[in-house]
């Protein structure tokens, strides 16, 4: 559920929504959501000073009932 929510959120703020993918991985530190976006959208997703990325992480933590990390990377 979290991966779909993050994907929907990010697809609405990027210029290339078809390049967005979110994969969920479980490890000993909790859940990890790996977000991949087009290189031209990475600045838009991270935001000035990381504000947008922090807002996305805050929304994810509010939706989750466990520890979740969100990693944002570009597709190369």
List PLM regions with ranges.
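RNA-contacting regions in translation and RNA-metabolism proteins
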Residues: 1-44, 53-76
């Amino acid at each position: 559920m979290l991966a779909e929510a993050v994907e929907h959120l990010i697809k609405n703020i990027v210029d290339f929504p078809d390049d967005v993918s979110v994969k969920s991985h479980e490890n000993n530190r909790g859940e990890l959501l790996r977000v991949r976006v087009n290189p031209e959208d990475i600045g838009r997703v991270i935001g000035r000073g990381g504000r947008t990325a922090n807002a996305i992480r805050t929304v994810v933590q509010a939706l989750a009932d466990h520890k979740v990390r969100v990693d944002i990377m570009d597709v190369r």
